[in-house]
Amino acid sequence: MKFAILFGGNSYEHEISIVSAVVLKKVINQNLEFIFCDEERRFYHIPSEKMNSKTFSTKAYKKEKELFIKQGGFFSKGFLKENKLECECVINLIHGRDGEDGKIAALFEFYSIKFIGPRLEASVLSFNKELTKLYAKSVGVKTLDYTILRKNQNSKEKLSFPCIIKPARLGSSIGISIVKDEKDLEYAKDVGFEFDNDLVVEEFKNNIKEYNLAGCMINDEFVFSIIEEPKKKEFLDFEQKYLSFSGHNELIEADLSEELKEKLKDSFKKIYNPLFKGALIRCDFFILDNEIYLNEINPNPGSLANYLFKDFNTTLNALADQISLEKMIKINYNFLHSINGQKGKL
């Protein structure tokens, strides 16, 4: 399977997406194409040998061929014709806005481009942490109790401390604060509201265990990664999350009973099927008093959580093989023909 990796985007997670693409280049042992979406949402074809931080930090990518999108794929302008970028499937590796909020999914479905990533409805529900909690509840998966703070609205909710405050539509731990008492609350709200108009507030629990599980559905069968118990302090910061998906830190397979492992997989299945078909996702769970709680859904996990799979390349290729394009509707204009055949034509 010939893949193209789409990365970048107009997102607070733009740089982590670049790092993710560089890491995935090293992981996927096959011929790849690289499509960079810059902050102006223009697409560039990046040669494999130029996939490094300097290409992007110095804006040298602007010297590369610019791509445009139309029915069936990405194209560049040649001297006498348009040249199509040769790939069979695009991997959506844009983290945060653009890649995970539904814009790319809608664009690819509209232009009949085969891709690995969340579809429109899945993107919308997983991008917003408030909607994620409502969705999880609807499919029978528990989440921690929460409060929503909205910008420019005076909330009368009484918060308990310590608590954790998260922007509703951001990942990579950006804008997150742990608030230990009321005197730190206003500052934490100011930080969060710099990134989002809605904040999710949860009680911070010291005795909670976190576990990550990635997977996908291939030919109606689930393929799971190992279950990871990440090393962390109070929460994973930006740097820790980079280290985790780049394979530079020690991977700890969770020491759990078979019963709890099956409970985690069962919760994953409820979240994934059928909404996330076509995507390889990672779900982050909490376990508290032997109960499973969904923390968040990562619809485009960093480097697609390759470090959690024993045979990542086989899984990725098998997933791509079974993705099909949306069936096009045949328009025959019979109704308009019938009108034209009558008196008083339209």
Curated annotation (Swiss-Prot):
Annotated Mg(2+) 2 binding sites: 296, 298
The keyword Protease is assigned to this record: no
Instruction: List each copy of the ATP-grasp domain by range.
Output: 133-327
Q: Offer an example of a GO molecular function term for this protein.
A: metal ion binding
Q: Pfam families annotated for this entry?
A: Dala_Dala_lig_C, Dala_Dala_lig_N
Query: Where found, per UniProt?
Result: Cytoplasm
Supply the EC number(s). 6.3.2.4
Q: In which pathway does it act?
A: Cell wall biogenesis; peptidoglycan biosynthesis
Reaction equations catalysed: 2 D-alanine + ATP = D-alanyl-D-alanine + ADP + phosphate + H(+)
What are the recorded Gene Ontology BP terms? cell wall organization; peptidoglycan biosynthetic process; regulation of cell shape
Q: What highest taxon heads this organism's lineage? A: Bacteria
Instruction: Return the broad EC class.
Output: ligase
> InterPro entries of this UniProt entry?
ATP-grasp (IPR011761), ATP_grasp_subdomain_1 (IPR013815), D-Ala_lig_Van_CS (IPR000291), D_ala_D_ala (IPR005905), Dala_Dala_lig_C (IPR011095), Dala_Dala_lig_N (IPR011127), PreATP-grasp_dom_sf (IPR016185)
Which keywords appear in this protein's UniProt record, sorted alphabetically? ATP-binding, Cell shape, Cell wall biogenesis/degradation, Cytoplasm, Ligase, Magnesium, Manganese, Metal-binding, Nucleotide-binding, Peptidoglycan synthesis
Q: What are the binding positions for ATP in this chain?
A: 159-211
What does the cofactor section's free text say about binding? Binds 2 magnesium or manganese ions per subunit.
Q: Which cofactor does it need?
A: Mg(2+); Mn(2+)
Protein family membership: Belongs to the D-alanine--D-alanine ligase family.
Protein function: Cell wall formation.
Identify the HAMAP family for this entry.
Dala_Dala_lig
The name this protein goes by in its record: D-alanine--D-alanine ligase
- The source organism is Campylobacter jejuni subsp. jejuni serotype O:2 (strain ATCC 700819 / NCTC 11168)
